[in-house]
Regions:
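ATP-dependent carboxylate activation and anion-phosphoryl transfer catalytic cores
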Residues: 89, 214-297
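A glycine- and small-aliphatic-rich helix-loop capping segment at beta-alpha/alpha-beta transitions
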Residues: 55-64, 140-141, 145, 274-277
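ATP-binding N-terminal substructure of ATP-dependent carboxylate-amine bond-forming enzymes
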Residues: 1-70, 74-76, 80, 99-110, ...
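Hydrophobic beta-strand scaffold residues
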Residues: 63-64, 92, 122, 279
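Active-site nucleotide/adenylate-binding loops and adjacent lid/helix of ATP-dependent enzymes
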Residues: 29-33, 74-167
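Phosphate-binding site of ATP-dependent enzymes
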Residues: 136-223, 249-252
Length: 297
C-alpha cells in the first residue's frame, strides 16, 4: 500500500458488501461470494466513521468492530455530540453552531452571538469532518469570517468553541456494556494547535504517555471518558479527547473519535500498551467485542 500503489494494482477486483443478510459478505464483480466473519473498519472521516458503512454492515448483519451506526453518526457531528454531552451534564468548552445557510442569511447576528458567548480567540471546526481537517483559530472578526468559509468548504455546518488554555489529553476506551479506560496521554503540538498538518506532517509534535498532569487528574479524565463513552452510546472502542484547563484544573470534553488510529505508533494502542495490554491482545479484544454483539444492534 505504500504511495497508494494498491489503487492501480492489476490484482484489484471490483466488489461490494451485499446488504442481503443471507449473503453475509462481499460479492465480487464476477458474482463470487466471500463470507465475512467480522469487519474491522479502518476508515476516517465522512462515509467512513459517520455511520454510513456501519449502517450497511448492520443491514447485512455482519459483526464489525466499533460503535454502531447511531453512535457513529452522533459522534461524527460535533454539534449533535456537544448537545448530547450537555444533556448528560458532561463539562465541555463553551460552544455554538451555525449552518452555512443561517450564517449567510444572518451573518452579523451569528457573529455577535459567537463573540459575546465565546470571546476571542475562537476555534472554528466543520461539524462533520475527520483528521482535524478545516479547523481554524480566529483572533478577530475578519479571521472569524474566513474561518467560517474554510469550515463550510468541508461541511454545511460549523461548530465554534472557546479557546482553552490548558493540556490537550486523550483517553482510550474499550468495551461494550462495561467499558474500561486505559492510560491518559497528552498531545504537545509543535504548531499553534493540533491541526491536520501538525498531526500528520510535523514530526516535532509530541505524544506523551502518561499525560503531564497529576494522577488524581488522570483518574478524573478516565472517569469522564467512560461517562462520555456511555452517554453517546459508544461500543467497541473510542478515543475520548479532553482539555484540562490550566487556571482551575477543570476537565472539559473536546470530542470522541469512534475510529481512532490503530497503527502500532497511534495514541490509542499506545495508551493500552501503557496500561498493560499489548497490541495483539488489544486487537483480539476489539474483535471479541464485535463478535459478542453478533450482527444484532
Amino acid at each position: 500500500m505504500p504511495e497508494d500503489k494498491w489503487l492501480n494494482s492489476k490484482s484489484l477486483v471490483p466488489a461490494y458488501i451485499s446488504p442481503d443478510s443471507s449473503v453475509h459478505g462481499i460479492v465480487t464483480a464476477k458474482g463470487e461470494i466471500i463470507k465475512l466473519d467480522c469487519v474491522f473498519p479502518v476508515l476516517h472521516g465522512k462515509n467512513g466513521e459517520d455511520g454510513t458503512v456501519q449502517g450497511l454492515l448492520q443491514l447485512a448483519q455482519i459483526p464489525y468492530v466499533g460503535c454502531d451506526a447511531t453512535s457513529s453518526g452522533v459522534c461524527m457531528d460535533k454539534a449533535v455530540a456537544n448537545a448530547v454531552a450537555d444533556a448528560f451534564g458532561i463539562n465541555q468548552a463553551k460552544w455554538c453552531a451555525f449552518t452555512q445557510y443561517d450564517f449567510n442569511k444572518n451573518r452579523q447576528e451569528c457573529i455577535d452571538t459567537a463573540v459575546n458567548k465565546l470571546g476571542f480567540p475562537i476555534f472554528v471546526k466543520p461539524a462533520n469532518a475527520g483528521s482535524s481537517v478545516g479547523i481554524t483559530k480566529a483572533h478577530d472578526i475578519p479571521e472569524l469570517i474566513e474561518a467560517m468559509n474554510v469550515a463550510f468548504n468541508e461541511d454545511k455546518k460549523a461548530v465554534l468553541e472557546e479557546f482553552i488554555d490548558g493540556h490537550e489529553v486523550e483517553c482510550a476506551v474499550l468495551g461494550n456494556e462495561e467499558p474500561i479506560a486505559a492510560e491518559v496521554g497528552e498531545i504537545k503540538a509543535a504548531a499553534e494547535f493540533y491541526d491536520f498538518d501538525a498531526k500528520y506532517n510535523n514530526p516535532a509534535s509530541e505524544l506523551c504517555i502518561p499525560a503531564d498532569i497529576d494522577l488524581e487528574k488522570r483518574n478524573e479524565v478516565k472517569a469522564q471518558a467512560v461517562k462520555a463513552y456511555k452517554a453517546l452510546g459508544c461500543e467497541g472502542m473510542s478515543r475520548v479527547d479532553f482539555f484540562v484547563r490550566n487556571s482551575d484544573g477543570s476537565v472539559l470534553l473536546n470530542e470522541i473519535n469512534t475510529i481512532p488510529g490503530q497503527t502500532p505508533i497511534s495514541m490509542y494502542p499506545k495508551l493500552f500498551e501503557a496500561a498493560g495490554v499489548p497490541y495483539k491482545e488489544l486487537i483480539d479484544r476489539l474483535i471479541g467485542c464485535a463478535l459478542s454483539r453478533g450482527g444484532k444492534f
